[in-house]
Amino acid sequence: EYQGKSAPPGPWVKVPEWKFDLEDASETFEQLLAIPDGDPWVDAAKDNLSSGCPVTAAITVEQIRRAKDLGVAECFQMELKIASRCIQLPDFPEGVRALLIDKDKQPTWTYSKVSDIPRDYLLSHF
């Protein structure tokens, strides 16, 4: 097992500890966006979260929830399965189109909100 060392404290590390409901991706997403503004790191993270693919946000919440009971090798296996599934579905090429090809930064996601994502669709990534 690898045991990492913690980073020295810095201005961006001084973020209060928040606890999130990882059982519900939509609720977790809303809790993250409700974190008060003011810290540049938190503000940038919230901007990225709100402008990114809702399915990816939901996947990340589910992935974190599952990873707490897994080892490193199992986490990498889960990551590979998720990535393999994501490239089969329309949101990945849509994100590439909007960011890299047309550069319009106006993706049309499969689901416009995390709360719209059916649980079965989310779980199909795992």
Briefly describe each language-model feature range:
Residues E1-F126:
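C-terminal alpha-helix plus adjacent terminal tail
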